[in-house]
Amino acid sequence: LTGERPVSGCAKTAKLHFTGDRPAGLRCPDCPEYRTCAESSYVVKNILKEDVQGDWCCFAKDTGNQDGASVIFTTASGMLVSYNQNFVVKKNAGRRGARLIGTKGSAEFDFYTAEIRRDDYLSPQTVTHKFTFPAGMHFGGDEQLALDFLRVLDGGEAQSDLAAGLVSAASCLAARQAAEEGRFVPVEY
């Protein structure tokens, strides 16, 4: 968003809720708590009336789910960029977007509310814009990047910024390494 690439990052993850002693490889329909577990595919679909993202048990011994994670990246200019994700949050408490804070104002956007908010520090007015985004999207562009990669392999032109996709992937890998090692690590391109 700022045109700068992350050069290093540190990260932490937490796993306090999605833990348990259920058998490895357990699927929701095979669990005795299928109709009562708040995270089961049955409850999510039929009681909460939400889209089911899968039916693997969130509380199995082999689950890779984390409750949340945070990363702080540094850029060459010294700017700090923070990213947080939380998978325990439900319904309207969820957020996905970014907030940019500067010396003259700030701007933020949220994919879930489809809003962009702009605050100019010299004006008492806050401006909010609504936008539309295709329903059911992950917002990360993973599918589009994969299709563009295949298009380039076939000799075609990319429709998205593949370099930005590689920066994103390198940043994610650095964040994972930083969380595992408990230290700042370089973002390698």
Question: Where do the protein language model's features map onto the residues?
Answer:
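Contiguous beta-strand/loop segments that form the cofactor/metal-binding neighborhood of enzyme cores
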Residues: L1-T113, L145-V152
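C-terminal helical cap and adjacent loop that interface with cofactors, partners, or active-site loops
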Residues: N65-M79, F87-Y189
